[in-house]
Amino acid sequence: MILAIVGMAMNMSVHAQVQFSKFKFYVADIMDFSHLQLETKFKVTSDRNLKYVHVFFTPVNGVGDAIVDEIRGGVNANVKHTKFHHIYATGPFESKKSYTKHFDPYYIGGKKPTPFPYKVVVDYMGGGSDTILVTKDNIKTYFPCLKWIDVDYKSGFQPDN
């Protein structure tokens, strides 16, 4: 039983479907330092072409707390603050090639946060998908550009999420 689990874990790390060499926020508007864009660069490491790449992440401050986005502009009672974000890139993405994508806007106050991924989903051309939960043991396989953070999801401002 233990050998089977170890074998599965080794198999998962060997068959990484996508690897991110860049996953970070940068200031998108020098007049408003809380207006951020997410810049990503990834390589398809799968032998199959990808249709979509989804990344689920949370912004994290310098002390490891998950932080919420801010709402700018008019008041909208239907908009919720959230600590959890989802981006997806639409392919096709060819095997063994690299791609750069930008996502925005994010309005996050305070010092520039770190976008910290917790799940990746890849959808393949022709059907099928894989879900990867990002862990301390596999973060360098999928996000070698990031260090592991023990994220505290309970501290700080608590919206209804």
What are these regions (language model features)?
Residues 2-4, 14:
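Cleavable N-terminal signal peptides
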Residues 31-33, 59-71, 77-78:
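Short aromatic-acidic-glycine turn motif
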Residues 72-130:
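Short, solvent-exposed, Trp/other aromatic-anchored flexible loops in extracytoplasmic proteins
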Residues 10-16:
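Sec/Tat signal peptide C-region and signal peptidase I cleavage site
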Residues 41-49, 61:
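Asparagine-centered strand-capping/turn motif at beta-strand->loop junctions
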Residues 32-40:
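Short, solvent-exposed loop/turn segments enriched in Ser/Thr/Gly
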Residues 108-161:
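Surface-exposed edge beta-strand/loop patches
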Residues 47-52, 66-68:
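Short acidic/proline- and small/hydrophobic-mixed sequence motifs that coincide with surface turns
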